[in-house]
């Protein structure tokens, strides 16, 4: 059994977790998350400099709490891991420097983890997670991607958003409707009282230079603009804006786009397992629609546990355990952080000469 202490500080959650595995069974001993939502809500979104300062303030307490809850001393940990890319650079540095300092202080091996690989690994804490190749829909505030994971756990991105990620669109529409930040939970809550078929909002596509459209890619900027124009027309007509109906219609269209393109991609690549992870994966409309539509195509859906959909250190620990178990990977202590790094470049984090 390997025990990993993992740190996640890529955006606005400060998280430390202790995880372990015995064979194919992964266990969470502690997963402490300190959210900064209240600090950023007044600004309508995450302020990078403020987020980094809050990580500095919160991380010592969160680390102590994680060790205490797991009933373990840091000397008993086998590996230490932290998110190193992609994310807000100042925030990533706080977690990375802390992790590498602990490694040097306690003579522990270090693993730098790709944030998206962490989200993909959150499914390892679910029962009967897929052991063979599968398609992952990663849908969060910063990313909307379709990633194929093969039998050897190699990763290939098959689809992506060309502008706003789905979670980003939720946040922007939430602000537009006066629902505050973060928009996802607020829209989902008020949409329960609305008619999802009230407004016919667009399902935007990306044109293919060869003709037609890119089958697996996403665009949510146009949908956001359509909601803005709808609200403007209603206001100009002197009518009351039906916020629940708009929220429900918006939520439905986002879910339909995600589900339709995910299932199309899975069918085309002959993948009969679909994994859904990331913050937006907590949306109940999306979860129900994905299961319902996939079942019609004999595709099995694996959903990330609700408490592991948003950013957390347990998923980073799971990614580290997976790297140790199947790849025997470790990172150089000189490895830095990067604001951008594609999922296909994740293996570079374990090269003798760090990429950054």
UniProtKB/Swiss-Prot annotation:
Coiled coil: none annotated. Its cofactor is Fe(2+). The keyword Hydrolase does not apply. Pfam families: TsaD (PF00814). It comes from the Bacteria. Binds 1 Fe(2+) ion per subunit. Its main location: cytoplasm. One of its GO terms (molecular function) is N(6)-L-threonylcarbamoyladenine synthase activity. GO terms for cellular component: cytoplasm. Keywords: Acyltransferase, Cytoplasm, Iron, Metal-binding, Transferase, tRNA processing. It catalyses: L-threonylcarbamoyladenylate + adenosine(37) in tRNA = N(6)-L-threonylcarbamoyladenosine(37) in tRNA + AMP + H(+). It is found in: Cytoplasm. Fe cation binds at residues 115, 119, 311. Its EC number is 2.3.1.234. One of its GO terms (biological process) is tRNA threonylcarbamoyladenosine modification. Substrate binds at residues 138-142, 171, 184, 283. HAMAP family: TsaD. Belongs to the KAE1 / TsaD family. Required for the formation of a threonylcarbamoyl group on adenosine at position 37 (t(6)A37) in tRNAs that read codons beginning with adenine. Is involved in the transfer of the threonylcarbamoyl moiety of threonylcarbamoyl-AMP (TC-AMP) to the N6 group of A37, together with TsaE and TsaB. TsaD likely plays a direct catalytic role in this reaction. NCBIfam families: gcp_kae1 (TIGR00329), T6A_TsaD_YgjD (TIGR03723). This is tRNA N6-adenosine threonylcarbamoyltransferase. It comes from Prochlorococcus marinus (strain MIT 9301).
């Amino acid at each position: 059994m390997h025990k990993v202490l993992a740190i996640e500080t890529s955006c606005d959650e400060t998280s430390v977790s202790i995880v372990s595995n015995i064979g194919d069974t992964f266990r969470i001993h502690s997963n402490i998350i300190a959210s900064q939502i209240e600090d950023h809500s007044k600004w309508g979104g995450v302020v990078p400099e403020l987020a980094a300062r809050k990580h500095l303030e919160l991380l010592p307490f969160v680390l102590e709490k994680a060790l205490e809850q797991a009933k373990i001393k840091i000397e008993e940990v086998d590996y230490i891991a932290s998110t190193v890319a992609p994310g807000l650079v100042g925030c990533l540095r706080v977690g990375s420097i802390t992790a590498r300092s602990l490694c040097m202080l306690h003579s522990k091996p270090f693993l730098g983890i790709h944030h998206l690989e962490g989200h993909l690994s959150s499914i390892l804490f679910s029962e009967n997670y897929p052991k063979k190749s599968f398609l992952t829909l990663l849908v969060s505030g910063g990313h909307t991607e379709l990633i194929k994971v093969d039998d050897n756990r190699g990763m290939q991105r098959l689809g992506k958003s060309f502008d706003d990620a789905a979670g980003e669109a939720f946040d922007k529409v939430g602000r537009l409707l006066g629902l505050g930040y973060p928009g996802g939970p607020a829209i989902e809550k008020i949409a329960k009282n609305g008619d999802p078929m009230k407004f016919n909002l667009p399902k935007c596509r990306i044109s293919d230079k060869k003709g037609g459209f890119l089958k697996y890619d996403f665009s949510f900027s146009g949908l956001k603009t359509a909601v803005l124009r709808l609200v403007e027309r209603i206001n100009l007509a002197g009518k009351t804006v039906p916020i629940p109906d708009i929220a429900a219609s918006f939520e439905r269209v986002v879910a339909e786009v995600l589900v339709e393109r995910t299932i199309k991609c899975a069918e085309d690549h002959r993948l009969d397992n679909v994994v859904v992870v990331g913050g937006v994966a907590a949306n109940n409309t999306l979860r129900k629609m994905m299961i319902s539509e996939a079942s019609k195509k004999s595709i099995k859906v694996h959903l990330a546990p609700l408490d592991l959909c948003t950013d957390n250190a347990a998923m980073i620990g799971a990614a580290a355990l997976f790297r140790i178990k199947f790849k025997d990977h470790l990172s150089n202590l000189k490895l830095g952080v990067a604001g951008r790094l594609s999922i296909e470049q994740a293996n570079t984090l374990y090269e003798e000469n760090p990429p950054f």
